[in-house]
Amino acid sequence: ILCYGLWKDYRYSQRKLADFCRKFAEYDERYFNKTYQKLVDELYNYTDWKVEHVKYTKDDYPHYKSKIMQASVEEQMRCANEINALSARYFTYGFCILIEDGFGSKKLTNFKDKAQKRIQSITGDMRTGTINDLWKELATGAGIYIEKPKID
């Protein structure tokens, strides 16, 4: 989502996208399995907003009498929470990199708003595509190939 938005909305070149991805990998290496609260605070101080992850609870999902169905729902909830926690972390990394690259508070907020709309377009009830569509367009249009995550 971040690279796609930078390419599509801000005309980042292949070189600038590759540099962004390199910096992102450095952040991930530096903060992997560590707290990143310092980054959250820096982002908030700069923009007056932060990327938050609100955990799903059992109240957000239907309850089934069947133990198998209920176990399936609980696993779905666990996976959704894990994905959302990583997404909050990764968006925070990306926004902090853009601050380093000179994005002002208003420009960064505009970028965040566009990213939220794009996420809604691929995950919401009225979705118009998938993350794979964006991934393919980024690979063919910008020449940036982003490895897909390996899922255990």
Where are these regions (language model features)?
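Amphipathic alpha-helical segments that form the core helices of the histone-fold
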Residues: 20-29, 111-122
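Active-site catalytic microenvironments for nucleophilic, acid-base chemistry
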Residues: 5, 9, 23, 97
